[in-house]
């Protein structure tokens, strides 16, 4: 297979300075509850429902003995979050007031002052909503209802007209795949406001185009008698890669502090690691991770978030995946540490060598369709998106 990658060069306009933009985080006075109960409990944002339940002493430690099994009810339950916030009168005078959700995990319905403003369906996307006509100075009520990812994944699988190879139905939803259990992780399919919510006030941007990378790193793929080469050079000299695989540093992502990122990455640097591969079953990492890799001169091989399964390529799924890619390429592509974008984790390998066709009893017709959908996602859509948002693309 030709590995789908993109060397980091910036072609898009990066929001390098926001002279007239002001930010108001919506992080205080949050509450949450089970939709089947009446009592509200205090919540931490960013956070997850599991960590909020732990903080309120409503569940035992999920990592102790067999508590993982005992706590599976959490992922089949719907959860509500709410807060009230104020804004200044000066804020209300601005022509543009956007409410930005940097990470909602995963299926969520959002209401502001009783108005339905968003239905989120992708953990990896950023959602920006114009709320100029809804916001008021006092007592703004923000309410979010999270739906069961397990139940939605199962319902989507049940109506699919073909079997998509996977050990469960995680491949039907855009959520961190390790949340459904992996060889290193328990099955704790959480939900919640896992990244910041904020108001962006104002709309005057200063942009800088065609920023050049500060690291002169290139991928070399030269045909030879047995295939083609695959190595990196820096300033024209081959690099001996001492790499490692990076998976999320905590099952509950908001618990990963900047200090924890720093400790782990400094340890990797001291061990001689010069490249980390951000694994496709996890997340597009936090800004702190990439900032630290930039400063430590640790290269990053960046997977897109697909791993060990075949994924649906219907129209709605393709559009969702496209927007996910755009959001994350725009957010990350200015980091010199990212030397490679990779389409997925092990799917081509699995299709050709893991016996999926026999294991999942696929007909020849189904196999042809699945491979065509694979190509749509990873060789057509990803190629088009990366080509438009980067200066150079190898695939």
Model-derived features: where do they sit?
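Loop/turn elements at helix/coil->beta-strand transitions in domains of secreted/extracellular proteins
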Residues: 139, 237-239, 269-276, 294-301, ...
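The substrate-binding groove and active-site-proximal loops of carbohydrate-active enzymes
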Residues: 118, 123, 183-186, 245-257, ...
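Aromatic-lined substrate-binding rim segments of carbohydrate-active enzymes
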Residues: 266, 275-321, 327, 383-387
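Aromatic- and glycine-enriched glycan-recognition loops and surfaces
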Residues: 73-79, 91-95, 127, 131, ...
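Bacterial Sec-dependent N-terminal signal peptides
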Residues: 1-22
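N-terminal carbohydrate-binding accessory modules
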Residues: 28, 206, 210-268
């Amino acid at each position: 297979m030709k590995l789908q990658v993109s060397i980091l060069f910036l072609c898009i306009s990066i929001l390098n300075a926001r002279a007239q933009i002001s930010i108001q985080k919506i992080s205080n006075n949050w509450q949450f509850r089970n939709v089947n109960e009446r009592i509200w409990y205090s919540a931490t944002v960013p956070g997850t429902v599991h960590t909020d339940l732990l903080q309120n002493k409503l569940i035992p430690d999920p990592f102790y003995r067999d508590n993982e099994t005992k706590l599976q009810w959490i992922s089949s339950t719907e959860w509500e979050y709410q807060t009230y916030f104020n804004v200044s009168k000066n804020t209300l005078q601005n022509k543009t007031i956007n409410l930005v959700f940097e990470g909602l995990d995963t299926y969520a319905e959002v209401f502001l002052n009783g108005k339905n403003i968003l239905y989120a369906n992708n953990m990896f996307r950023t959602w920006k909503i114009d709320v100029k006509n809804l916001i008021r100075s006092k007592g703004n009520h923000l309410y979010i209802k999270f739906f069961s990812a397990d139940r939605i994944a199962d319902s989507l699988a049940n109506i699919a007209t073909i079997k998509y190879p996977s050990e469960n139905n995680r491949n039907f939803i855009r959520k961190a795949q390790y949340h459904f259990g992996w060889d290193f992780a328990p099955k704790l399919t959480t939900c919640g406001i896992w990244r910041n919510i904020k108001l962006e006030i104002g709309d005057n941007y200063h942009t800088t185009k065609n920023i050049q990378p500060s690291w002169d790193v290139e991928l070399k793929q030269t045909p030879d008698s047995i295939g083609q080469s695959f190595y990196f050079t820096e300033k024209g000299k081959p690099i001996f890669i001492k790499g490692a695989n990076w998976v999320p540093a905590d099952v509950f992502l908001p618990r990963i502090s900047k200090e924890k990122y720093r400790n782990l990455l400094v340890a990797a640097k001291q061990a001689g690691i010069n490249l980390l591969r951000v694994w496709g079953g996890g997340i597009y990492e936090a800004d702190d991770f990439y900032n630290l890799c930039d400063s430590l001169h640790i290269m990053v091989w960046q997977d897109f978030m697909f791993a060990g399964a075949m994924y649906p390529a219907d129209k709605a799924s393709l559009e969702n995946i496209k927007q996910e890619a755009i959001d994350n390429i725009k957010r990350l592509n200015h980091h010199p540490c990212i030397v490679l974008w990779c389409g997925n984790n092990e799917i081509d390998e699995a299709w050709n060598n893991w016996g999926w066709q026999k294991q999942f009893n696929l007909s020849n017709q189904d196999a042809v369709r699945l491979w065509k959908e694979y190509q749509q996602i990873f060789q057509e859509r990803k190629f088009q998106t990366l080509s438009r948002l980067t200066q150079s693309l190898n695939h």
